[in-house]
């Protein structure tokens, strides 16, 4: 019985890593950055992206994500950028897990899991524009 071995995806020369603005050169250093700067342990990354804990662990070890996984990482990265504009980055991991009256007692991470991330984006818009919430 033949064993299928996944070959790592190669990047074309000269193409900049999509998350280079985070100081990351690969997905392992990107996830390390999230843990350090945003205080987001692996379970939080797992819940925000919808990845299994095992998938997050593999990415942390340097595995290249699928295009679907990369899209989820981009969406999470955009959310972290938005949240960083209204709070200290080191508070984000904690904030994501706290029940919030603005979200009817749900935690922001629960909103993401339920597909209601638009409620977080609306809150960010209101905070940044000075609109009453």
Region spans (language model):
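Non-transmembrane "mature" sequence context
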Residues: 1-133
């Amino acid at each position: 019985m033949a064993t299928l071995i996944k070959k790592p995806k190669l990047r074309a020369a000269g193409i900049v890593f999509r998350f280079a603005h985070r100081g990351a050169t690969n997905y392992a250093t990107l996830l390390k950055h999230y843990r350090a700067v945003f205080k987001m342990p692996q379970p939080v990354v797992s819940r925000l992206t919808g990845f299994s804990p095992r998938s997050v662990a593999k990415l942390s070890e340097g595995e290249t994500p699928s295009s679907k996984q990369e899209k989820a990482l981009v969406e999470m990265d955009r959310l972290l950028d938005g949240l960083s504009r209204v709070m200290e980055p080191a508070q984000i991991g904690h904030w994501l897990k706290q029940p919030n009256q603005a979200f009817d007692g749900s935690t922001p991470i629960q909103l993401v899991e339920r597909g209601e991330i638009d409620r977080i984006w609306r809150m960010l818009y209101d905070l940044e524009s000075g609109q009453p919430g």
